């Protein structure tokens, strides 16, 4: 197994942001978004990563950016290192396959979450009071049930180490104005529906996902990552059975191990065992092949 890329060190380049998974460099005209193999769970970056994960996320996002282009513009300029500025070329080996040259968008301060099925924190909330993010749901749903229609449940965008906080639609109006809030909601549901339909044909249920949007020349565009195993719950369609937790192609495998380990969900996180890493690598590779046809 290859070694995980946990850090990028390009001393003659301008690092402007280090996120949970991505390192962002300013090249002057554009940003260079390098997707590392770091793994975050429960809003904590874990000490060891998943080898090759950054390449999987980049390929899947590139696939979806192209699929969604008729619905919404995006920030992707190129994933080909040959197109990157000269200052990047000495680092071509590290950058190759895990990097996007992207437009300089101004991120909007909302995580746009769409839920097509009830699972995870949404299921816990429904068990407690019959609601999901303040939205009352029909009685009688079971864990992993498909919702009558996809729900838009936005949250704040937390800094590294902080937790995202669910907010209602009215709060997004306060944050970004009614017109943009409505646009983000409508686009999120449209993108989810198109992506979920595409994935279903390939044997994958996208149970829920999150999108991020930004502004370029005052136009709302899709940024960051799109419907990857890091930002979504992916379930195999052939084993789907409502009434309990589902097998998954995403980092739920790691989340389940973390819960069983007795970790208190506070930083620092525990070291992930090699068998859990190997299993996660296999799941990410499988979903890449199913969705994009690439290896």
Swiss-Prot record:
Entry GO MF terms: ATP binding; phosphoribosylaminoimidazolesuccinocarboxamide synthase activity
List the Gene3D superfamilies hit by this protein, alphabetically.
ATP-grasp fold, B domain, Phosphorylase Kinase, domain 1
Q: Which reaction does it catalyse?
A: 5-amino-1-(5-phospho-D-ribosyl)imidazole-4-carboxylate + L-aspartate + ATP = (2S)-2-[5-amino-1-(5-phospho-beta-D-ribosyl)imidazole-4-carboxamido]succinate + ADP + phosphate + 2 H(+)
GO biological process per UniProt: 'de novo' IMP biosynthetic process
Keyword ATP-binding belongs to the record: yes
| Pathway this chain belongs to | Purine metabolism; IMP biosynthesis via de novo pathway; 5-amino-1-(5-phospho-D-ribosyl)imidazole-4-carboxamide from 5-amino-1-(5-phospho-D-ribosyl)imidazole-4-carboxylate: step 1/2
Any idea which UniProt keywords this protein has? Answer: ATP-binding, Ligase, Nucleotide-binding, Purine biosynthesis
A cellular component term from Gene Ontology for this protein is:
cytoplasm
Instruction: Give the E.C. number(s).
Output: 6.3.2.6
PROSITE patterns hit by this protein? SAICAR_SYNTHETASE_1 (PS01057), SAICAR_SYNTHETASE_2 (PS01058)
Which sequence ranges are marked TM in the entry?
none
> Which EC main class describes this enzyme?
ligase
Output the superkingdom of the source species: Bacteria
Which protein family is named in the record?
Belongs to the SAICAR synthetase family.
PANTHER family membership:
PHOSPHORIBOSYLAMINOIMIDAZOLE-SUCCINOCARBOXAMIDE SYNTHASE
Question: Which NCBIfam families does this chain map to?
Answer: PRK13961.1, purC
Q: What is this protein called?
A: Phosphoribosylaminoimidazole-succinocarboxamide synthase
In its UniProt entry, the species of origin is given as Desulforapulum autotrophicum (strain ATCC 43914 / DSM 3382 / VKM B-1955 / HRM2) (Desulfobacterium autotrophicum)
User: Gene behind this chain?
Assistant: purC
